[in-house]
Amino acid sequence: MLQIITGKFYNSEDRYHNDCKGILYSNASFRGIYDIGHVKIEAAESLGSVDPYIVMYDNQLQKSHSGFELVKVGDEEILRQLKNILSFALDAVFDEDKSTVERICRKKESGRGKYPVPSEFINGTLDISKNVSDDEMKSCGVFLEQLLALNREDYINILNCIVAYNASVRLLSEDISLAYSMLVYCLESLAQSYDSYTPIWDDYKEDKKNALEKVFKTIDEETVEKIKGILVKDEHLKLSKRFQEFVVGHVGDEFFNYREKRKIVGKEEFLVALVNAYNIRSKYAHMLKPLMKHLRMSEFSKNADVFEFQHNVYFTYSGLFRVVREVIYNITFSLQKTGFGARI
């Protein structure tokens, strides 16, 4: 709905215009009025740690001249889409319900409960009264404009991933394993939509490949090639390699730059951690196998991309969170924009 009300898909300027308002609450803090992607957002008077914002937009309807009266619909869906996009673009939490923001962003009270709260897993995103600069608001506007300018299918693909990304944050207090897997789902969904990688024999698991190569020596070459062709069509192999190639291809060099007080994943560790994240998601999806104990502990996550255990490297929740943000942002700006007047 948010994309539709911009008038992008209408072929006539003969329209009804409906000035609409809604309220969103957030831990993000800024003042004034901002125009961002066909929407105005204005800070309202705040009486607590969570700030209210008035969202204003024009819910446009093209006149049909059919003799039937058109009824304005979709305000709830518009706010749902907007809260998710703002949450992603401003790296914060937006919601129609103030108590939801307070619950997600709450701090752990001393001596209460042994389970960590979401804010202990990721740094900055869930800070109360998180200051947002003018430049950050402008960047948010640029992102929203780019997203709204995509064709309908691309817009829905990206929006669905952003919704899943935000759902992952909300799941942190309930099930860290599911929250972690949800981030991997985001990457998988994008990979399946935008990558057409075709696996080759060298992609096959090394141990199985070596064992088969010994058997192949006893078979004629033509038969060997046919068998290899069947094996590399294995769906799991295809999905796994597509996932890896897509993510690596949408992570820029700046992602690996040094940051003070944070352990950043190295380029040589990245693919190993990525493969492990994919396997963790697979085990959770098929066997409900939870994350290893260390990855469920917030102290390993907040200020480090990766955790090393038994000579292996794993993404922490916050590390994987950074990867997903990077990939969603980069794929959004890599997609072609379509002009107004395009068909749905």
Locate predicted features:
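Amphipathic, oligomerization/interface secondary-structure segments
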Residues: 21, 149-344
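Charged, non-catalytic interaction/linker regions at domain boundaries
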Residues: 1-181, 185, 306-343
